[in-house]
Amino acid sequence: MKADIMKKFLLALLFAPAIALGAGAAVHLDKAPDLQGDKAALQNGARVFVNYCMNCHGLSFVRYNRLTELGLSEQQVMDNLMFTADKIGDPMRVAARAAEQKQWFGAAPPDLTLVARARASADGSGADWLYTYLRSFYRDEKRPNGWNNTLFPNVAMPHALWELQGELVLDAETHALKLATPGQLSVAEYDKEIADLVGLLVWAGEPGAGFRKNLG
């Protein structure tokens, strides 16, 4: 039953954004680091996700107690990563209901459990897509939320991590992104945060897969 649900969920992620994916098809994907055996990186990815992404996006197929597979104790998970649940066995869902999110945003933001698998294509892995996407936001005054993205043009999602990265602008002549206002992190530090976050999203799609691979 769970496998059928996950299959339907994956298909929804694959086909719902087809137009947007086509719009960004010509953009080169940067290679994401493979961090599936790096528990410290995945722990940091969980921290970034909970603090910056989980106001809108959940990982509903992952229960909080699965985070102990990353080397965290249950107490560490409860103290530092559980802000929308009461029990360690609860799914990692957002606190707001889908109907409320639809009212606020026009559509409920998608659950991200399987996003890394759904974004895989002939152009690169889902991790590559996410790693590029989360580093490709730029200021665009023409957009309702003030942001745009070179990989996913006219995306409705704002840049949730802009305080860390800073503000990028798109050069009208070269179509390259350049830093206009520095953020809290250097470029290298921000890239590392995103790599860790993407690593966590890859792990969420199949918890434990990377560790099993390392064990042979």
Place the predicted regions along the sequence by residue.
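Extended, hydrophilic extramembrane loops/domains of integral membrane proteins
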Residues: M157, W162-E206
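Hydrophobic, aromatic-enriched interface-forming segments
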Residues: S125-E141
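Gly/Gly-Pro-rich "capping" loops immediately C-terminal to redox-active cysteine motifs
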Residues: L35-Q36, L42, F61-A127, P144-H175
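Post-cleavage N-terminal segment of exported redox proteins
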Residues: M1-Q36, W203-P207
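The canonical Cys-X-X-Cys-His
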Residues: F49-S60, L197
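Electrostatic cytochrome c docking/interface patches
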Residues: G24-R47, G58-E69, V77, G205, ...
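Surface-exposed patches in mature extracellular/periplasmic domains of secreted proteins
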Residues: K142-W147, A209-R212
